[in-house]
C-alpha cells in the first residue's frame, strides 16, 4: 500500500529535552560508535536523535524518532521493523561499483554479476525490490531449496529480449536437489532464464544427465568445491570447507565429474566453479588464500577441456557490526573495495599465468546487501534496579549478622572499599547458610541481601571513578547492571543474538544529547532465561551492559533501536511463547521527505494460534461453555462473563506484543 509523501520536518512528536550541558552528541557518538558501524546511513542529529540517510552519501536524512512516532499515529504498534528501500538499492549499487573499479584498476577483461542468495531474507517485498533495483546490472538470484527456486523463477523476469546470453541474470541452483528440482531448473531455460545447476554431490550429476537427455535440454552446470587451504582448517568457517564439509565436491570428485561429462560428450556444459566460505568472513587473509586455491582450480578445469565461463566466489563479504574494523567475528578488517580488489587480482594473476581467459565474476553477498536496510525499534516496558533502594539500619535486637553488614555498609570509603567488599561477600554467604539451617528468618535474610546489594552499589560507584579497576572488582560491571524489560522477543526478532552470540548495534534512538547514567541488560517478553541480550558492541571487547537513560514517569516511551538486522533475522525467527511476526513498514525517500511504500501487519493472536493448529472459533466456544457452567454454579455473574468473553474475542484479533 502506498501513501502520500510525508515531509521530514512535519512528522509528529518533537518531545526533546534540553541538551545536558555535561554531555554532548559527540560523546554519544564515541560511546555508541554510530559512525563506525553506521556510516553513511546512520548518524546523530543536533536534537539528540538517530537519523537515517537512506541514500547514503548522496544526502537527505530522516529523523528516526519522528518517523517512529508518525508510524505509531498510524496504529502500527511496537516492536516495529522499518525497512529502507533506498538503502537496499544503495548497497547493491556500491557492490557493483566496487567491482567495476577493481576491474578498471587491474584492466580485467571481463565483467561482474551480483547474485542475491534468497535464503538471506526471503520476504517478498525485499526480493522483488532487489530484482527491480538490479535490472540494469543483471543481478540474479540464488536458490538453496525447491521453495526458493519457485521464488526465483516467478520473480526474476525472463530476459527474452537480451542479445548477450552471457550477461543475462543468473539463477544459481544450490542446495540438496531431487529429480523434480532438477527438472524444474532445466525447464526454466525454455523461458529464457539462465539457470546454472551447481553439482554438490556426485549423484546429482547422474540425475542431471538423465533428465536433460529426456527433456532434450542442454544443462548449464557448475561444481561447488570444498577448499582445503590451511587457514580454513583452523578458522571459524572451516565447517563449510575441507574434507568434512557438509556440501561440495572434493578434488577427486571434481575429476570424476570431468570424466563423466567427457564420457557423455557434455564437457562443454560445465560453466561455473563455485565455492562458499560462509556469510561473515572477518579476515581478508582467509579470502585471499581461498581465492588463490579457487583461481588455480579454475585454470586447471579450463586446461582439462571444460568450457568455463563463471567463477562464483559465494558469500563471505562481512558486515562490520561493532565498527572496530578488526578480524573479530562481529567485524571485518577490510572494506568492500578491498574485497573486490583481492578477488579480481587473484583470478587475473592465475589466468595470466595459466594463459586462459578470465571468467565472469559472481558473488552471493547477501549479508552485505541486506543487513543495513532494516532497523528494529522497540520500547522499554519497565526496569529492575539492583541494589537501588536505600537500606534501613537494623534494630537493636537484630541478628548480629545484620549489624555486621550494616557496619560494613557505613564504613565503605574510597580508601578501604576492597576490605569491605570481601566482608560483604562473606556475610552474604553466611546469611544464606544461616537461613538454610533455620537460624535466620525470611525477613532477616531479605534485609541482609538488601544491605549487601547496597554495599555493592556503593563500592561499584567508587570503582567507576578509578583509572584502573582491580580484577576482583571487574565482575561488578556485570553484577550491578540493571534490567530493562523490552517489548520484543529475542527468539523472533534477533535469533542470531541468542543462538550464535551475534552482536548487533543497540542504542537509544533519542535523548542522545543527555548522559546515559544507567547500565543495563535487556530482557525480552518470553519466559525463557535465554530471552535476554547481555552482550553489546565495544571497540576493544564485548561489553556486558548497555548504557541507557533512566526511565521517566512522564508517560513518554523510551525507544531503543537494533540496527543492521536485515539479513537472516526475520526468516530464522521462531514462535517461542507464541510471540509472532512483528509489524513491518517499507519506507522510500522522496524530495519532500518520505513515503510509506507498504505495510505488513504483524501476526494477530488468531494467526499465531492457527500455526499450532488452534481454531479461534473453537477456542471461543470452549471458553463460552466454561462461562456457562460457571454461571450455572454461581461462580461468575452475567456481567463478568460478558466482559470476559468480549475481552477474549477482542484479544484474538490483537497483536501478540504488548500495547
Curated annotation (Swiss-Prot):
The gene is speA2. Its EC number is 4.1.1.19. The modification N6-(pyridoxal phosphate)lysine is found at residue 119. It catalyses: L-arginine + H(+) = agmatine + CO2. NCBIfam families: PRK05354.1, speA. Belongs to the Orn/Lys/Arg decarboxylase class-II family. SpeA subfamily. GO terms for biological process: arginine catabolic process; spermidine biosynthetic process. Substrate binds at residues 311-321. Its cofactor is Mg(2+); pyridoxal 5'-phosphate. It comes from Synechocystis sp. (strain ATCC 27184 / PCC 6803 / Kazusa). It is an enzyme of class 4 (lyase). Catalyzes the biosynthesis of agmatine from arginine. Signal peptide: none annotated. This is Biosynthetic arginine decarboxylase 2. Keywords: Decarboxylase, Lyase, Magnesium, Metal-binding, Polyamine biosynthesis, Pyridoxal phosphate, Spermidine biosynthesis. It holds the Pfam family Arg_decarb_HB. GO terms for molecular function: arginine decarboxylase activity; metal ion binding.
Amino acid at each position: 500500500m502506498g501513501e502520500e509523501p510525508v515531509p521530514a520536518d512535519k512528522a509528529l512528536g518533537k518531545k526533546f529535552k534540553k541538551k545536558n550541558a555535561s554531555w554532548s552528541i559527540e560523546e554519544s557518538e564515541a560511546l555508541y560508535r554510530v559512525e563506525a558501524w553506521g556510516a553513511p546511513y546512520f548518524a546523530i542529529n543536533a536534537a539528540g536523535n538517530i537519523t537515517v540517510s537512506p541514500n547514503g552519501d548522496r544526502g537527505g536524512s530522516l529523523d528516526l524518532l519522528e518517523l517512529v512516532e508518525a508510524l505509531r499515529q498510524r496504529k502500527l504498534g511496537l516492536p516495529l521493523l522499518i525497512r529502507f528501500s533506498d538503502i537496499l538499492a544503495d548497497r547493491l549499487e556500491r557492490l557493483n561499483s566496487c567491482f567495476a573499479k577493481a576491474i578498471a584498476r587491474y584492466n580485467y577483461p571481463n565483467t561482474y554479476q551480483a547474485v542475491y542468495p534468497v535464503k538471506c531474507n526471503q520476504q517478498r517485498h525485499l526480493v522483488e525490490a532487489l530484482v527491480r533495483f538490479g535490472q540494469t546490472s543483471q543481478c540474479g538470484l540464488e536458490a538453496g531449496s525447491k521453495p526458493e527456486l519457485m521464488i526465483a523463477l516467478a520473480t526474476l523476469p525472463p530476459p527474452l529480449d537480451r542479445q548477450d546470453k552471457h550477461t543475462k541474470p543468473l539463477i544459481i541452483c544450490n542446495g540438496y536437489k531431487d529429480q523434480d528440482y532438477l527438472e524444474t531448473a532445466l525447464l526454466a531455460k525454455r523461458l529464457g532464464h539462465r539457470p546454472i545447476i551447481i553439482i554438490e554431490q556426485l549423484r546429482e550429476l547422474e540425475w542431471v544427465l538423465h533428465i536433460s537427455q529426456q527433456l532434450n535440454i542442454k544443462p548449464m552446470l557448475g561444481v561447488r568445491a570444498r577448499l582445503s587451504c590451511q587457514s580454513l582448517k583452523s578458522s571459524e568457517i572451516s565447517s563449510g570447507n575441507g574434507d568434512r564439509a557438509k556440501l561440495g565436491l572434493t578434488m577427486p570428485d571434481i575429476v570424476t565429474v570431468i570424466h563423466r561429462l567427457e564420457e557423455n560428450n557434455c564437457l562443454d556444459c560445465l560453466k561455473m566453479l563455485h565455492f562458499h566460505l560462509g556469510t561473515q568472513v572477518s579476515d581478508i587473509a582467509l579470502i585471499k588464500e581461498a581465492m588463490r586455491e579457487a583461481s588455480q582450480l579454475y585454470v586447471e578445469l579450463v586446461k582439462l577441456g571444460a568450457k568455463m565461463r563463471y567463477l562464483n566466489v559465494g558469500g563471505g563479504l562481512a558486515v562490520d557490526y561493532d565498527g572496530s574494523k578488526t578480524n573479530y567475528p562481529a567485524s571485518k578488517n577490510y572494506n568492500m573495495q578491498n574485497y573486490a580488489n583481492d578477488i579480481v587480482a587473484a583470478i587475473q594473476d592465475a589466468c595470466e599465468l595459466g594463459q586462459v581467459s578470465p571468467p565472469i565474476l559472481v558473488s552471493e553477498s547477501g549479508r552485505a546487501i541486506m543487513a543495513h536496510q532494516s532497523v528494529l525499534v522497540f520500547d522499554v516496558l519497565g526496569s529492575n534496579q539492583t541494589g537501588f533502594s536505600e537500606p534501613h539500619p537494623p534494630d537493636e535486637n537484630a541478628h548480629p549478622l545484620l549489624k555486621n553488614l550494616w557496619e560494613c555498609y557505613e564504613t565503605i570509603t574510597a580508601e578501604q572499599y576492597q576490605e569491605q567488599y570481601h566482608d560483604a561477600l562473606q556475610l552474604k554467604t553466611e546469611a544464606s547458610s544461616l537461613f538454610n539451617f533455620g537460624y535466620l528468618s525470611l525477613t532477616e535474610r531479605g534485609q541482609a541481601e538488601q544491605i549487601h546489594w547496597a554495599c555493592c552499589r556503593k563500592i561499584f560507584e567508587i570503582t567507576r571513578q578509578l583509572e584502573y579497576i582491580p580484577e576482583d572488582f571487574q565482575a561488578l560491571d556485570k553484577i550491578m547492571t540493571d534490567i530493562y524489560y523490552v517489548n520484543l522477543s529475542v527468539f523472533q526478532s534477533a535469533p542470531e543474538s541468542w543462538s550464535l552470540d551475534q552482536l548487533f548495534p543497540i542504542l537509544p534512538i533519542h535523548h542522545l544529547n543527555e548522559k546515559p547514567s544507567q547500565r543495563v541488560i535487556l530482557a525480552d517478553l518470553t519466559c525463557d532465561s535465554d530471552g535476554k541480550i547481555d552482550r553489546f558492541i565495544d571497540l576493544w571487547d564485548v561489553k556486558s551492559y548497555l548504557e541507557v537513560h533512566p526511565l521517566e514517569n512522564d508517560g513518554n516511551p523510551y525507544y531503543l533501536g537494533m540496527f543492521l538486522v536485515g539479513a537472516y533475522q526475520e526468516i530464522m525467527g521462531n514462535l517461542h511463547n507464541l510471540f509472532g511476526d512483528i509489524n513491518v513498514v517499507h519506507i522510500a525517500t522522496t524530495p519532500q521527505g518520505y513515503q510509506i511504500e507498504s505495510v505488513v501487519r504483524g501476526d494477530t493472536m488468531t494467526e499465531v494460534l492457527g500455526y499450532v493448529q488452534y481454531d479461534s472459533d473453537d477456542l471461543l466456544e470452549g471458553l463460552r461453555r466454561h462461562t456457562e457452567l460457571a454461571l450455572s454454579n454461581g461462580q461468575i455473574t452475567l456481567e463478568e462473563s460478558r466482559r470476559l468473553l468480549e475481552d477474549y474475542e477482542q484479544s484474538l484479533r490483537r497483536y501478540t506484543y504488548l500495547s
